[in-house]
Amino acid sequence: MNIHEYQGKDILRKFGVAVPKGIVAHSPEEAKQAAEQLFEEQSSPVVVVKAQIHAGGRGKAGGVKLAKSPEEAYEIASQMIGTTLVTHQTGPEGKEVRRLLVEEGMNIDREFYVGITLDRATSQNVLMISTEGGMEIEKVAEETPDRLLKIQVDPLFGLQGFQAREAAFFLGLEGEQFRSAVSFIMSLYKAYTSIDAALAEINPLVVTKEGRVLALDAKINFDSNALYRHKDFLELRDITEEDPFEVEASKSNLNYVRLDGNVGCMVNGAGLAMGTMDIIQLAGGKPANFLDVGGGASPQTVEEGFKIILSDKNVKAILVNIFGGIVRCDRVAGGIIEAAKKIGLNLPVIVRLEGTNADIAQKMLDESGLNLIAADGLKDAAQKVTEALSA
């Protein structure tokens, strides 16, 4: 689960992570009041008005602006709130700006990157440090790997002081800035583990000309599987920032991710779903979604899956790929037929069913009289997807 920057900073502040003072605003009037308060409390000649959306690249897209007065903050907020911000992470449709973070200005001297996430290859947390702050860490890792330090952290022992000192030394910090950075990194790791985060990313971490070490931006992603331990964090979820199809799918416990292709796919099992998407691509189509209906696919989940797939107007054909292990293929076939009649499917649906009672399922599909095309194996399914798209 993702949250906004201002929410992430509020959480980090409770763990002693240094962040600039900021006030969230939902209107130009609130932005002006926030700026007035910050100008009274700080010596900086500017405040920063930042659009709050679940996407990076806001600065380049015009979502981060400086204001030298409360009146200017009001004008900036008037232009931002209600507009659609398009960044390299939002896609061409962009995201609507509904709230802003008005924050004290910083006299920045240097910018760095600090991030913590899970390294699945080693089953350990990894602390990532880079001297290239403000840049995408993937780009840094690819183009200038010598400027990125990765420190594996044993979850049994946690982040050790010598590891935090190694990170601060890598950044070239000295004296009080060195000690502040060590304290910052230790506090960030404590926050990361305490809240069961999947990612804690500070980009950039800044050192001001006055010597302060702060998180200028903060991205916190929660491990959704651990949210039952942090029910108060559920209140931080902003559904308006999420894909409406994915929100609807989650209500039916379906794992759905919308893509930009033309072939909808419904599969049971994440691995099979990934393979099915590859098959669609090789067949000349483009997957319109990732949809895993789970190991216990029922007529109800199949029906909901079809509804969600059909709500995407770019879909020209649907491939259903089910391996019947726990779930019986004839039960899934019955769900497909029932859903097709109920919804009124008018797109070609290619169905590949293998496993328990697959022969019975095949017969049910053949005798249904519906536009359901049975496929015998993955290769045949791929060929029939190609034929359906070219028809």
Swiss-Prot record:
Pathway recorded for this protein: Carbohydrate metabolism; tricarboxylic acid cycle; succinate from succinyl-CoA (ligase route): step 1/1
Organism (species): Chlorobium phaeovibrioides (strain DSM 265 / 1930)
Root EC class: ligase
UniProt subunit comment: Heterotetramer of two alpha and two beta subunits.
Residue numbers binding substrate: 268, 325-327
UniProt KW keywords: ATP-binding, Ligase, Magnesium, Metal-binding, Nucleotide-binding, Tricarboxylic acid cycle
E.C. designation(s): 6.2.1.5
Residues that hold ATP according to the record: 50, 57-59, 103, 106, 111
Entry GO MF terms: ATP binding; magnesium ion binding; succinate-CoA ligase (ADP-forming) activity; succinate-CoA ligase (GDP-forming) activity
Cofactor: Mg(2+)
Listed name of the protein: Succinate--CoA ligase [ADP-forming] subunit beta
Cofactor mode of binding and number, as noted: Binds 1 Mg(2+) ion per subunit.
Lineage: Bacteria, Pseudomonadati, Chlorobiota, Chlorobiia, Chlorobiales
Family: Belongs to the succinate/malate CoA ligase beta subunit family.
